[in-house]
Amino acid sequence: MPEVDVRLERVTKLFGEVAAVDDLSLDIATNEFFSLLGPSGCGKTTTLRVIGGFEDPTYGTVYLGGRDVTDLPPYQRDVNTVFQSYALFPHLDVYENVAFGLRRKKVEKSEIDRRVTEALRLVDLAGFERRKPGKMSGGQQQRVALARALVNRPRVLLLDEPLGALDLKLRKQMQLELKTIQQEVGITFIYVTHDQEEAMTMSNRLAVMRHGRIEQLGAPEDVYEHPATEFVAGFLGASNLLDGEVSSLNGRAQIRLSSGETVVAGDPSIDAGVGSSVRVGVRPEKISIVSQEEPAASGRNHVDGTVRLATYIGVNYQYRVDGPGGRQLTVFVQNQGAAGSHPSVGQRVRLEWLPEHTFVVEPSGESLDQEEEER
């Protein structure tokens, strides 16, 4: 069992009568790249601030490396934080910005030089030692902020949406660089973001948060492929959801849709009995779109529909299809360069997908139209 670097035990943080974090318990393993993911106001940043000591929990306990640090200020915790605002000293060059914390700790000059040089190598800024922050790009400044945190060799590095101010291309580049750096230095990274792709790209595990609680926790591929709740299905990537009722649990769950069709879910362990109302989901990229004139493929779920919108994105084609009960379904088809083989607007089509790509979640209590408006 991996060693735990960070443990939260039943942590609650109240602001007035509002619970920004609500009875949250969580273990984060040593050397893990862990992301707190969720929409604005879900409690992810407050959770990070509680770990760092910038907010005191109203209730609960915070452990770092097995030590109770709940009542310790930030400077007595073995953590460093990188914020979206780089907070660099404009009058100091790169070297002195990175060395600042070490000088305050009165580290020997030779050790400072060695550690600053190594930190700048890690973030690919060797040769920039004497440059001022004002002469650097946003991506370079973010690297300086990261080097300044890493040079202190903290047990845990907290990152609060550090890439949010960068443009899309640079943000994607920095995602891969952060993951590479984390693997090289072997420090536990705890990363806060609202960007689903960012969290899935970098994380060993992630927690999807909502209303101060964790909706689902796990490896990115597990959470994406097997969402536990309707919220997770809609927040972490795109999903198509249809209302139905469990009609059979003989090996595989059979669900009769409200529009009359029957689909099969590959997971036999769904938490619903025969007769239960459920919502059936499938990701857009899991669906094949074919002409209704073609025979239906055996062993696959299928529903009929009419193409209402076709969009060329470059890497794929995206379709909106009027499906069962008037529900609009989204389909992503990989662009493989076959000209003339794509359905057109107004065409009657069949949507097909494998049972193992079907997931089942409990209805939220709101209509699917309301759910889409919220997302």
What is the role of each PLM region?
Residues L24-S35, F89:
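Pre-Walker A (P-loop) beta-loop-beta motif of ABC nucleotide-binding domains
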Residues L37-P39:
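The feature captures the beta-strand-to-loop junction immediately N-terminal to the Walker
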Residues T58-T61, E111, H211, D243:
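Conserved coupling/switch loops of ABC nucleotide-binding domains, chiefly the family-specific signature
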Residues G52:
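Helix-to-loop junction immediately C-terminal to a conserved catalytic motif
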Residues G60-D68:
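Conserved ABC transporter NBD signature motif
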Residues F33, L72-G234:
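ABC ATPase nucleotide-binding domains
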Residues S239, S248-R375:
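Non-catalytic connector elements of ABC transporters
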